[in-house]
Amino acid sequence: MISDKTLRVFLAYKKDTKDVGKFPTVNFLRDYLRSENVEIVTDYKDIESCDVILLVTLKLFSKVRGAAKEFNKKIIAIPFGDHANFKKKKNELILTNIKSLNQVDLICVETKGQMEFLKKSSVVTPISISWFSKPMNQRTSISSLEKTTFNKYFGISNDSHSIIVLGCTDSFKKAQSLARMAPGVTFVFVDISSVFLKHRWITEKIPNLYYEIGMRDELYPSGIASASAVVILERWFMDMIVILDAIASNVPILAVDIPLVGTEIQAGTDFIATEESPVGIYESLQDLKHNPISDAASSDLLAKIKNDENHKFIDVIKNEIVSPKEEK
């Protein structure tokens, strides 16, 4: 471990004003580093004075590679911090810039599903499960209806279950209906639309329904791992990363009016396509192999992350700095 001197980290990510708000992982990463008293550097001419390079936008690898070699700096990649690192092809999510990703020193991922995705993409660089240790309740979500703790959002106890519902503004009413039909289950509705709900639009407070804004990155890893099920209400949100995280954690997926998009979904998890009505969704939830509605006492779904994998991200950075850099 290095000394307690202030770390200087070069953060390589795409700074495009029209994309502000799309990459909450980048925003969270900046907040996290600052909370650990890390100095963030973004000017390329100052790379020499930095301790390590964090590569978020993969296509910027060519801009930092030369300086990393010249000044003997390690490059740690965080590929899931930028949606621009991926593209969709025939309903599958494809990783771009694989060649550059295989030339960095370390790749940090947040979930086992992300790790499996990289392995399937033929990424051979050493991979580390490196959790951002800052809890959910310390993250700022200005559009949430209310500020709740991490446990209230995604916590699972022996007598309750939580179901993550992915949808857009128009499908929020379905989530409300589901919450009314299953009062003993906590529903977390994640709004993935571009036009978000306003506080005044929600006229009824449902105790077991929470509202959150965000794309994939807003689903804190332990949220997927500890959920009883993931319900996808929008056909265009068949995000393979979310699916892989659910598969890795043995969490069933319920998809509304969505055709088969890949054999890996069928092979890896309990996947059911259902009709669009709230009643149909409710009945399909009861049909899952592990029933999150009636089987509330079951612990089979609680795929918890092992303590020895809960590495603090800042310590991963420090350990990489003191390790000798090998030529690639």
Predicted features and spans:
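Conserved acidic donor-binding segment of nucleotide-sugar-dependent glycosyltransferases
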Residues: 270-279, 287-292
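Nucleotide-activated donor-binding/catalytic signature segment of Leloir-type glycosyltransferases, i.e.
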Residues: 198-216
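C-terminal alpha-helical cap of glycosyltransferases
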Residues: 284-291, 304-328
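Short hydrophobic beta-strand element within catalytic cores of glycosyltransferases
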Residues: 252-255
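Conserved donor-binding/catalytic core segment of Leloir-type glycosyltransferases
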Residues: 157-173, 188
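A short, active-site helix/loop in glycosyltransferases that binds the activated sugar's phosphate group
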Residues: 103-126
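Membrane-proximal helix-turn-helix segments that form the acceptor-binding/catalytic region
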Residues: 90-107
